[in-house]
A protein has these predicted regions:
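Short S/T/G/P-rich N-terminal loop/turn motif that feeds into the first structured element of a domain
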Residues: 1-38, 47-55, 65-149, 158-166
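A common structural junction motif
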Residues: 58-65, 171-172
């Protein structure tokens, strides 16, 4: 069903950008697929449009009826770098958050770096998995093995920055 979603998403009113993701086993930070956990990122014209679509669009109704668990997380970007499929979907709109902060990191792993990337993944997964400042985390893939992303929610920005810039192999 996930692969067919692109046809419905292309037709949705007020949907400015979207991406479908698969996940890896465990917390998602492995190259072995988990065919029961998927992700969908949507950038809407407004939060009102997003909430209306979640309630009324047939695609979302089907997902809700078939899934054992779903989560919808509404966010406003505070920072963004680079392009994604030729677009800049996240336009910073808010000041630096005082409390919870969600982070989405995305990378296309070079073929020559795949082995070292996946060799480092278990260590990073273990560290983020035991960090008491992480509220939620999952590894996802836009394209299996190569185009990877992480999505995490932290208690605050300083905890996330400390993890990202001061811990072992994740530093570089």
């Amino acid at each position: 069903m996930m692969g067919l979603a692109r046809f419905g998403l292309k037709k949705m009113e007020n949907l400015e950008f979207w991406k479908l993701f698969g996940s890896g086993t465990g917390e998602g930070f492995t190259p072995i697929p988990n065919f029961s956990v998927y992700g969908l990122l949507c950038v809407w014209e407004s939060e009102t449009a997003a909430r209306k679509a979640l309630l009324n669009e047939e695609l979302f109704k089907k997902y809700m009826s078939r899934a054992s668990h779903t989560s919808a997380i509404f966010m406003s970007p505070v920072s963004s770098r680079g392009y994604w499929s030729g677009a800049q979907p996240f336009i910073a709109k808010k000041d630096t958050p005082k409390d919870f902060v969600a982070v989405l990191t995305r990378a296309t792993v070079r073929w020559s770096k795949l082995k070292s990337f996946w060799k480092e993944a278990p260590g990073i997964s273990n560290r983020i998995g035991t960090d008491k400042n992480v509220m939620f985390k999952i590894g996802l893939g836009e394209v299996p093995i190569r185009q990877q992303l992480t999505f995490s929610i932290w208690k605050n920005l300083s905890h996330m920055e400390k993890f990202a810039h001061q811990t072992g192999s994740h530093r570089d």
